[in-house]
Regions:
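Disordered, acidic Ser/Thr/Pro-rich linker "stalks" and the adjacent N-terminal cap
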Residues: 17-66, 72-81, 89-93, 104-113, ...
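C-terminal outer-membrane/trafficking sorting elements
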Residues: 361-405
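Serine-esterase "nucleophile elbow" of acetyl-processing enzymes
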Residues: 136-208, 222-231
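Active-site segments of SGNH/GDSL-like serine hydrolases
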Residues: 238-242, 262-295
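Catalytic His-Asp segment of secreted/periplasmic serine-dependent ester chemistry enzymes
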Residues: 244, 280-361
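Trp- and acidic/polar-enriched beta-sheet ligand-binding modules for extracellular glycan
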Residues: 31-32, 77-81, 88-159
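Oxyanion-hole/transition-state-stabilizing segment in secreted/luminal serine hydrolases
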Residues: 179, 215-256, 279-281
Length: 405
């Protein structure tokens, strides 16, 4: 249990992001009992750096009481997060039914005693993360009876104090191609860029782009989205291209209603939404441009719902069409369109981390000379309690910033 003394007007600090250290970065992954690979823990999603396996183990070491285990798959050429788009079918993930095991005494990742910490059944997505109890353990292992496909990355984060630095990037083929980091092996992801600017933070980020998908598809599959990624703290949303395809406004009202439904569902799960402005096409190649009414609707939704403002993909790609492919719509890997998307996302969400970093520094200074005139913020595991100088509890918040009753 930790105590911080804060002035009363700083109570909003209860909503700050809590760092969840990446424990697996650079660790060796042991594959199928007799192989090892640094591909799976290098932070890169470059498509050729994968391992086909149904048994992956990582030595994390002792310390954390709880960890967030995430994985990214390639699925034999498929980059789409799920087969949820009515307009076009996608390659389904092979990693459907599997278990996550933990061990305290393994020496190789395959010997020793193992406990089943989490079981996943009927999984439909290529990227996902789950919270796992890790008290007294030192090894993590993913085990599937069937072929699991191609692992791009396996990451393990320390969430002993909460898991609210966790992100899901919901999007279209623009995100499927851009956020999947296909530009080159040197492309820096949004998570890498945030870590460079704010070294205390190593965000857990799941990529969720689906080609051909529109907001109606997402609303129709909201139960599946919430089952797979309802446990993260932020949904970073890139949508609108397929809803506004062709440049007309015939689908505008449906788009707005669908986005509001998605926002409401996220909020009901304690998820904060960051909404990007829809990407501009290169109209000389695509033959159309997004109607400005879509942008106005997105701006209104951000204001009305109190959302975080995401990147302005429209303004950037309107000014820099050279980052788009020959179809005039998708980020061009050869010219760095994907890298630009990662940079724009990092720039958009950096203020969230800047506010947190500033608050923590300020509060540490004040805590060192605390006086009875200051309120107390009590951090106990994943919850935060604010108390007045008289000891009265003002409010309790969980690690996601939600009121804890």
């Amino acid at each position: 249990m930790k105590f911080l003394a804060l002035p009363l007007f700083c109570a909003a600090w209860a909503f700050a992001i809590l760092p969840n250290e990446n424990l697996s970065q650079g660790k060796m992954a042991y594959v199928d009992g007799n192989d090892s690979s640094a591909y799976l823990t290098d932070g890169s999603l470059t498509n050729w750096k994968y391992k086909e396996s149904k048994n992956v183990a990582l030595h994390i070491g002792e310390g954390p009481s709880k960890v967030f285990v995430s994985w990214e798959l390639y699925s034999f050429g498929g980059i789409d997060w799920a087969d949820f788009a009515l307009a076009c079918p996608h390659t389904k993930t092979l990693l459907t039914d599997f278990a996550i095991l933990t061990s305290a005494n393994s020496t190789t990742g395959f010997d020793g005693d193992w406990d089943t910490a989490y079981v996943v059944t009927q999984n439909q997505v290529l990227a996902r993360g789950v919270a796992v109890d890790f008290e007294g353990k030192s090894w993590i292992r993913l085990v599937s009876d069937d072929n699991a496909g191609q692992f791009l990355e396996v990451e393990v984060f320390d969430i002993s104090n909460g898991q609210n630095d966790t992100w899901f990037f919901m999007g279209t083929s623009i995100s499927a191609m851009g956020i999947k980091q296909q530009d080159s092996d040197t492309t820096k992801t949004t998570a890498m860029l945030i870590h460079e600017q704010f070294p205390d933070f190593t965000p857990a980020m799941l990529r969720g782009g689906v080609s051909c998908i529109n907001t109606t598809d997402i609303v129709n599959h909201l139960p599946e989205y919430l089952e797979a990624v309802g446990n993260v703290n932020f949904w970073a949303i890139e949508m609108g291209t397929n809803d506004g395809w062709g440049g007309g406004t015939w689908n505008l009202s449906t788009y707005v209603q669908n986005l509001q439904t998605i926002i409401d569902a996220a909020k009901a799960y304690g998820i904060s939404v960051v909404l990007a402005r829809t990407l501009a096409t290169d109209s000389s190649k695509a033959g159309w441009q997004l109607a400005p009414e879509f942008l106005a609707a997105e701006d209104s939704l951000i204001q009305v719902n109190g959302l975080y403002q995401g990147p302005d993909f429209y303004a950037f790609f309107k000014e820099h069409p050279e980052y788009l492919a020959s179809d005039g719509v998708h980020p061009n890997g050869e010219t760095g369109g994907g890298a630009a998307m990662h940079r724009l996302w990092a720039e958009a969400i950096a203020p969230i981390y800047a506010d947190t970093t500033s608050a923590i520094y300020s509060h540490r200074k004040r805590a060192s000379s605390a006086s009875p005139s200051l309120v107390k913020v009590i951090v106990n595991g994943g919850s935060v309690e604010i108390r007045t100088p008289k000891g009265n509890s003002v409010q309790n918040f969980d690690a996601k910033g939600r009121i804890a009753h």
